[in-house]
UniProtKB/Swiss-Prot annotation:
Function: Catalyzes the phosphorylation of the 3'-hydroxyl group of dephosphocoenzyme A to form coenzyme A.
Primary residence: cytoplasm
HAMAP family: Dephospho_CoA_kinase
Subcellular location: Cytoplasm
Keywords: ATP-binding, Coenzyme A biosynthesis, Cytoplasm, Kinase, Nucleotide-binding, Transferase
Pfam families xrefs: CoaE
Top-level division of the source organism's lineage: Bacteria
Name of the protein this chain belongs to: Dephospho-CoA kinase
Protein family (similarity comment): Belongs to the CoaE family.
BP GO annotations: coenzyme A biosynthetic process
Limits of the DPCK domain: 4-203
GO molecular function: ATP binding; dephospho-CoA kinase activity
Amino acid sequence: MTYIVALTGGISSGKTTISNGFKKIGINVIDTDIIAKNIIEKNLQVSFSIKRKFGKKILNIDNSINRLLLRQYVFNNHHHRLWLENLLHPKIYQESKHQIKMTQSNWCLWVVPLLVEKKLEKKAHRILLIDTPVKEQIKRTVRRDKISFLEAKKIIALQSSRKTRISLSDDIIFNKKNFKKINLYIYYFNLLYSHLSRIYNKNKTINIKKNFLTKFY
């Protein structure tokens, strides 16, 4: 059975940088954002439902769905956001399970930004959190997505708090400005998770306390 490490963190925390680092050393990465993107773009039934629900306001000139506009639109409406989540999340989870099952590396990295919000923490054997100060998240989100300060603040307010994410995580990388030692992080955690994977596949149990934290600051 595949040993699953869930990578999570708030918006603009640096999850992609870390997941790409693991990918470069051969770890299978299952990214729910990429899965969601593929479902929206390639599942005709899903794309038709979204277009019918939200109309032209979330479309590009070529009639394809603009995911950034879609995200901004649903964040402003609780009912629309729930509708979209109910449409996408079951499909995202099913595809995640399929990709995890096909894993070839010693362990796999399951990238789930909404791990805590969707109460999926028990679906992974270990949780790695990328933790970032809220002010830094807002600044990065405004710069990356070209949205206003208030829009970025609203998105972050809808996510779980840093305190909640930290309380549920096993390992933490604190990313305030940049990853100066990213290769060290990747090297260390690959050794740790490969070791835990071997123990798990041999005994099916690992006697490490849930709140045993490995922190990198």
